[in-house]
Curated annotation (Swiss-Prot):
Similarity remark: Belongs to the CinA family.
Source superkingdom: Bacteria
Membrane-spanning ranges: none
Gene3D superfamilies tied to this protein: 3.30.70.2860, CinA-like (3.90.950.20), MoaB/Mog-like domain (3.40.980.10)
Pfam families referenced in this protein's UniProt entry, alphabetically: CinA, CinA_KH, MoCF_biosynth
Name this polypeptide is given: Putative competence-damage inducible protein
Length: 412
């Protein structure tokens, strides 16, 4: 079954709020085998909403509306759909009692426009609103399914989970949707796609969807099957084919983000970490401390932005700073080794470079050096040539730090 999500609200068109409902619904619908091919946003306008309904009816089996169920004059979703379908609106007694009780308890006047929230399409399945007043509803008519949901996410999401999804399962084939996200770093989206292009071109079940984000690339593998175990087998087969080709860049699944994976490995190895940050200015250390219980492996860090701190706190030789410069392989090496010694850690990692927008020390923005000093191992320095805004260069540098730390920890 194919669905279209129609979000109603002028505030969405003006960019005053984000349409998070569509993201939530798309993910939930996919998990029960309902395809979402279109998202539509329309303002609080009867004529344009009617046009959106007519277009959606031509290309979708299910129309899911969010918003426009409230008490004000511009809340017109129910009225427009009722007119389109030739259905009347009737009061739902449970919703009316709930709204009436609320106004009695709060001592407020129960006006006619507030009663409007209890109106539902005649013959519809009514979905209780446990976190608000306006109920949702579902109606199967003329070979189409119409779902009306409140706009506020705090009302819509629990309503969907408790009442709407069980209702929608009556219209699905019973196939289970199983997805797995493979996470890669150190390879661009175009490079990765070239290596697995034949698999993408030949995809049927499972499907392969690449996505690039902040220097990472993910591949979402999605399989459909009535048996979840069989769906997992379909995905595992394709995953094995992918990792045969680009496994060296793979680091985790789903929500296993790079910095969490690196910290997990530190804990597993029983090693401690210290950082010296010039370019990144604390970004790396901040991400380290997002992990619970990280005090067992993270000694701390030094933000050595000024050369005085590099020289007098982390003992980078003056001749290195004056000859090679603060943005250099030698400086990164000294910073990593000396912060390790200063904070008595097993591993020291350092970041120095040019974030931009201007050049520094005759080096272009994006020139970055990441140093990694591990006890009983030779110190290594990774030169990077990054692009992007000042903030993007800093964030990507920190991410490369986690990547090289993770890969090095895998080796030892």
């Amino acid at each position: 079954m194919n669905a279209e999500i129609i979000a109603v609200g002028t505030e969405l068109l003006l960019g005053q709020i984000a349409n998070t409902n569509a993201q939530f619904l798309s993910e939930k619908l996919a998990s029960i085998g309902i395809n979402v091919y279109y998202h539509t946003v329309v303002g609080d306008n009867n004529k344009r909403l009617q046009q959106a309904i007519e277009v959606a009816e031509e290309r979708a089996d299910m129309l899911i509306f969010t918003g426009g169920l409230g008490p004000t004059k511009d809340d017109l979703t129910k009225e427009t759909i009722a007119s389109s379908l030739g259905e009347e609106l009737v009061y739902d007694e449970n919703a009316l009692a709930l709204i009436s009780d609320y106004f009695k308890r709060t001592g407020r006047e129960f006006t006619e426009n507030n009663k409007k929230q209890a109106l539902v399409l005649n013959g519809a399945n009514v979905f209780a609103n446990d976190h608000g007043m306006a109920p949702g509803m579902g109606l199967n008519k003329n070979g189409k399914v119409y779902i009306l949901l409140p706009g506020p996410p705090k009302e819509m999401k629990p309503m969907y989970v408790s009442y709407v999804e069980p209702f929608l399962r009556n219209f699905t084939t019973g196939e289970n949707i199983y997805s797995r996200v493979l996470r890669f770093f150190g390879i661009g989206e175009s490079q990765l796609e070239v290596k697995v292009q034949d698999l993408i071109d030949g995809q049927t079940n499972p499907t392969i969807a690449p996505l690039a984000n902040d220097g990472e690339v993910t591949l979402r593998l999605t399989a459909k099957h009535q048996n979840v175990d069989e769906a997992e087998k379909l995905i595992q087969h394709v995953e094995d084919l992918i990792l045969e080709r680009v496994g060296e860049f793979f680091y985790g699944y789903d929500q296993e983000f790079l910095h969490y994976k690196a910290i997990e490995l530190l804990k597993k190895k029983g090693l401690t970490l210290a950082c010296a940050e010039s370019l990144t200015g604390g970004l790396f250390g901040n991400q380290v401390t997002e992990s619970a219980g990280v005090s067992s492996v993270f000694k701390g860090g030094v933000i050595c932005y000024h050369n005085d701190v590099k020289q007098h706190v982390l003992h980078v030789p003056e001749e290195v700073l004056s000859t090679d410069g603060a943005v250099s392989k030698e400086c990164a090496r000294y910073l990593a080794e000396n912060v390790k010694e200063l904070l008595k850690a097993d591993i020291g990692i350092s970041f120095t470079g040019v974030a931009g927008p201007d050049a520094s020390e005759h080096k272009e923005p994006g020139t970055v050096f990441v140093g990694l000093a591990i006890k009983d191992e030779p110190t290594v320095v990774f030169p990077l040539n990054l692009s992007g805004s000042r903030q993007q260069i800093r964030e990507r540098s920190a991410k490369y730090g986690f990547y090289h730390l993770y890969k090095k920890l895998e080796e030892i």
